């Protein structure tokens, strides 16, 4: 007959077993937004990100948040395209954690008047002193919310005891052309790592690596978007990314990561 544990002993063993389940990882990799073209991009992610990390003995967990739309409809810029969303192709990236939410349901909860000023659009239109295209604004809000929900998946793991040194935000629809420069990232844990291209009106926001504390800000920046629009003119993705990085005094490290967005 095995040993019988008293109440205090059972409590101690339970704590020890929970500690055994706690893991420390180098990276949390968050995929966000519509998957769109994963069947054409996933091999580059495997070769240029996952294999590179494994070769460098870096540990990671992958998280994906994406949306479902009415009838699987998707668009490029403001144009609806005939290709429907394939809700199974995400499996090619093998995320450890996956969430699919209703985009239309989310948008119904958003007051677009806080982000897109119709009077400015009517008088000035699409320009730096006017507004961004209305469909791009709604797309961007969905992207930011997807980042937030993806980050909350990571946060849930942290609340259960897991730890992550870095958090990577990455679009699933990019084809990556060179190896992720992991040495440049891990050698600078207090910097925000951004590709050295596609900054436009601010800072590239399609791929970002930050430490966990910085990711708590960056991953939830949608919460400050309406206030930004009040005081800083029209919303543009790169412009707002630069605003947040500057506001919170984050130092940027431009890394050599070349990629192209792959359309369906």
Which role fits each region the language model picked out?
Residues 10-22:
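Short, Lys/Arg-enriched N-terminal segments with co-localized hydrophobic residues
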Residues 6-8:
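Intrinsic-disorder-associated, low-complexity terminal segments enriched in Asp/Asn/His/Tyr and depleted
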């Amino acid at each position: 007959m095995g040993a019988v544990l008293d109440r205090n002993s059972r409590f101690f063993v339970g704590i020890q077993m929970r500690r055994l389940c706690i893991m420390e990882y180098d990276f949390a990799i968050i995929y966000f937004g519509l998957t769109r073209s994963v069947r054409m991009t996933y091999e580059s992610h495997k070769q240029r990100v996952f294999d590179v990390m494994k070769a460098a003995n870096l540990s990671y967990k992958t998280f994906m948040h994406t949306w479902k739309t009415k009838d699987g409809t998707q668009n490029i810029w403001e144009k609806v395209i005939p290709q429907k969303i394939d809700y199974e192709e995400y499996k090619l990236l093998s995320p450890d954690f996956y969430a699919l939410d209703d985009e239309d349901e989310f948008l119904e909860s958003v007051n677009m008047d806080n982000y897109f000023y119709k009077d400015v659009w009517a008088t000035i239109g699409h320009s730096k002193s006017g507004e961004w295209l209305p469909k791009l604004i709604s797309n961007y809000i969905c992207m930011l919310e997807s980042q937030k929900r993806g980050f909350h998946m990571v946060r849930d793991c942290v609340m259960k005891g897991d730890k992550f040194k870095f958090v990577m935000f990455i679009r699933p629809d990019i084809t990556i052309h060179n190896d992720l420069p992991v040495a440049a990232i891990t050698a600078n844990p207090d910097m925000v790592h951004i590709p050295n291209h596609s900054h436009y009106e601010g800072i590239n926001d399609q791929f970002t690596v930050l430490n966990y504390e910085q990711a708590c800000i960056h991953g939830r920046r949608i919460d400050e978007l309406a206030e930004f629009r009040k005081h800083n003119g029209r919303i543009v993705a790169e412009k707002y990314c630069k605003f947040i990085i500057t506001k919170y005094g984050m130092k940027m490290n431009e890394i050599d990561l070349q990629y192209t967005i792959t359309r369906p």
